């Protein structure tokens, strides 16, 4: 009797919960969207200094924003797409139940803010990372986005299959990374990002282009050199303390992630393509690239 009673009851409760959750989700989305777009407007119209942690993703930007959010006088935003072309392309990929992801709406609001307040100084922080390590991390953080709703559960796949998927993601990310710098830095702010030199030994560099103050750096040296550069970039009297990045163990996928990292071995010719890219040659020393190759080469 309890089974006959329980199944319909549980189905009914699940439907009620689904309807309630959907309404809450919609209201929560609208509240968060309004809060973030108002924050953009207040930052550009007021006394706060806008700081855009503007990256192509999975390069440690969350840790930097966490630190900046503890400071007064700044309005910080973690962004991936601000340019019109970038937002349009991302919108076609980031589908969220017929709603725009909030970070794309924020990107559009930031672009409007920069147009409406042309004299406002804008600070931009961007980071890079070993492209192979980044692609593997991105796969584990965004499997549905990369593989689709029916792409399968990475945790239930053989390690060999996940390794194959990771290799394919590396290939697809190369062009994305190059286009991102052209669109989201050079195109958006009106200068050739790669025309100026980069201090590859220090791993970070500050430059100014008109209203833009830009700090670019390497994730691999963030814990060593990032704090002093960020402090100087923000006009602080001391280094900016950066929290440790989240350990992979906290995600519940540590074992598979480490197995994939250890099992992923790529042909030398393919690594030539990866590490001879414009982005890698701009940011990394030959010794650093050799170190990456030793990790990943078959």
Which sequence ranges carry the predicted segments?
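Membrane-interface amphipathic segments in extracytoplasmic regions
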Residues: 2-298
């Amino acid at each position: 009797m309890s089974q006959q009673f329980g199944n319909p009851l549980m189905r009914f409760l699940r439907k009620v919960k689904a309807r309630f959750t959907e309404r809450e989700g919609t209201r929560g989305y609208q509240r968060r969207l309004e809060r973030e777009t108002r924050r953009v407007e207040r930052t550009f119209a007021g006394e706060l200094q806008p700081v855009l942690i503007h990256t192509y993703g999975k390069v440690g930007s969350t840790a930097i924003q966490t630190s900046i959010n503890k400071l007064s006088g700044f309005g910080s935003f973690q962004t991936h797409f601000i340019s019109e072309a970038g937002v349009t392309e991302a919108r076609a990929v980031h589908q969220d139940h017929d709603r725009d992801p909030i970070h794309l709406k924020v990107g559009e609001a930031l672009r409007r803010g920069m147009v409406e307040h042309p004299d406002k100084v804008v600070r931009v922080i961007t980071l890079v990372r070993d492209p192979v390590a980044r692609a593997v991390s991105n796969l584990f953080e965004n499997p549905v986005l990369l593989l689709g709703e029916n792409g399968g559960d990475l945790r239930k796949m053989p390690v060999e299959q996940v390794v194959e998927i990771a290799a394919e993601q590396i290939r697809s990310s190369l062009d994305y990374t190059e286009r991102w710098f052209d669109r989201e830095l050079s195109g958006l702010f009106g200068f050739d990002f790669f025309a100026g030199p980069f201090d590859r030994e220090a791993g970070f560099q500050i430059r100014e282009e008109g209203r833009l103050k830009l700090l670019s750096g390497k994730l691999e040296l963030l814990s060593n050199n990032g704090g002093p550069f960020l402090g100087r970039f923000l006009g602080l009297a001391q280094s900016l303390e950066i929290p440790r990045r989240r350990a992979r163990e906290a995600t519940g996928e540590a074992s598979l992630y480490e197995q994939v990292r250890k099992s992923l071995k790529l042909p030398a010719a393919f690594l030539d393509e990866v590490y001879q890219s414009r982005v890698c040659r701009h940011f990394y020393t030959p010794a650093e690239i050799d170190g990456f190759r030793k990790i990943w080469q078959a």
